[in-house]
């Protein structure tokens, strides 16, 4: 059984993330969405909220599970007994960053492989950062996120 991890902060999960997850779910036996605590980032949603939103957004995918983690991704991968990391690439900037990370992952966890997927064209510009910024400033992000996330964002930014 090929078990892979798709890691990220997912603050919030977007339709671009969901596109990558859905396509990876068709390629691998089991996908674990690793939701990173990312304490150095100022997140809109808590780790627990992000895990819940990812779970709700992927509930229709039977071979996808979600787990929060803190610390190194390679340690999480080792704990989950996964040796493949799925990463999304939108631009050449993403590629350069991910290429560096991949080299580090291989040093820290020999045998780990990274698989890169590009999003569907309509999501190539989309990022959680953009969604957060637009939402915080009163913009409508409904078309960019799953319905449960849209509802959660509206509630969160109304406070």
UniProtKB/Swiss-Prot annotation:
Its EC number is 2.7.7.3. CDD domains: PPAT. The record marks 17 as: Transition state stabilizer. Its cofactor is Mg(2+). Substrate binds at residues 9, 41, 73, 87. It comes from the Bacteria. Pathway: Cofactor biosynthesis; coenzyme A biosynthesis; CoA from (R)-pantothenate: step 4/5. It is found in: Cytoplasm. GO terms for molecular function: ATP binding; pantetheine-phosphate adenylyltransferase activity. One of its GO terms (cellular component) is cytoplasm. InterPro entries: Cyt_trans-like, PPAT, Rossmann-like_a/b/a_fold. It is an enzyme of class 2 (transferase). GO terms for biological process: coenzyme A biosynthetic process. Its main location: cytoplasm. ATP binds at residues 9-10, 17, 88-90, 98, 123-129. It catalyses: (R)-4'-phosphopantetheine + ATP + H(+) = 3'-dephospho-CoA + diphosphate. Homohexamer. Reversibly transfers an adenylyl group from ATP to 4'-phosphopantetheine, yielding dephospho-CoA (dPCoA) and pyrophosphate. Belongs to the bacterial CoaD family. This is Phosphopantetheine adenylyltransferase. The lineage of its organism: Bacteria, Pseudomonadati, Pseudomonadota, Gammaproteobacteria, Vibrionales. The gene is coaD.
């Amino acid at each position: 059984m090929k078990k892979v991890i798709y890691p990220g902060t997912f603050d919030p999960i977007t339709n671009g993330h969901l596109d990558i997850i859905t396509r990876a779910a068709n390629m691998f036996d089991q996908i674990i969405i690793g939701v990173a605590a990312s304490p150095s980032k100022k997140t809109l949603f808590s780790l627990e909220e992000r895990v819940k939103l990812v779970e709700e957004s992927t509930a229709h995918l039977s071979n996808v599970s979600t787990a929060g983690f803190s610390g190194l991704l390679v340690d999480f991968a080792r704990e989950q007994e996964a040796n493949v990391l799925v990463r999304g690439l939108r631009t050449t900037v993403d590629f350069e960053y991910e290429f560096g990370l991949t080299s580090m992952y291989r040093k820290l966890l020999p045998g780990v492989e990274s698989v890169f997927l590009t999003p569907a064209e309509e999501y190539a510009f989309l990022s959680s950062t953009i969604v957060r910024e637009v939402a915080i400033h009163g913009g409508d992000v409904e078309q960019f996120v799953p319905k449960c996330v849209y509802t959660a964002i509206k509630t969160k930014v109304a406070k």
